Amino acid sequence: MTAVPVKEPMKESLTESLVESLAEHADRLAIHELMYRYARMVDFREWKLFDQVFAADATCDYVSSGGIAGTAREVMDWLDRALAPWPTNLHFVTNLSIDFEAARKSARTTCYFLGPMARGEMGKDQLVISSSGLYVDRVRKQPEGWRIAEREMRMTIMQGSLPEGYAIPD
């Protein structure tokens, strides 16, 4: 069997198409990793990852969970206080959809989250509650990588109840 010769312009076109496709897949993978990094940052209180997750001018809206809206740093500071009484957190992010904008320099993303939290001793007096919903984001490609520029947390399900008299620490 002999190979069919491919004309040079066609080779160039195929190469450019392949390179573009690989670049898009690399961006998609990087955005997936960004969502996982956010979950790790929150669950393990690794706030040093903040600049690897959020753009410097990022905003967040966590009002649907009883939280606040503001700069990402303000909202993450609030979240740190809100989660302080809950030492065990397991964040799951899944079903991520990515719609690129502007020559793949930004994208709109939506993903589901499930966030069980626990306090007390496992098998004894442990209290577990869980919230679920959507993260609706605008992410932006920066020289150092993809970052969340805008995040809206839309809580849609709450399983369990907060303890009576529970208040988020100041």
What spans do the regions from the language model cover?
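Short, low-complexity N-terminal intrinsically disordered segments enriched in polar/charged residues
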Residues: 1-40, 44, 48-52
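Short beta-strand segments enriched in hydrophobic/aromatic residues
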Residues: 42, 54, 113-115, 152-155
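A solvent-exposed, acidic/Ser-Thr-rich amphipathic alpha-helical stretch
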Residues: 47-116
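Short, P/G- and charge-enriched loop/turn segments at secondary-structure junctions
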Residues: 82-85, 123-127
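Short, surface-exposed coil-to-beta transition loops
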Residues: 91-93, 130-135
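Short, cysteine-centered beta-strand-loop-beta hairpins and adjacent loop/turn segments enriched
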Residues: 115-125, 158-161
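Flexible, surface-exposed loop regions and adjacent strand-edge segments
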Residues: 167-169
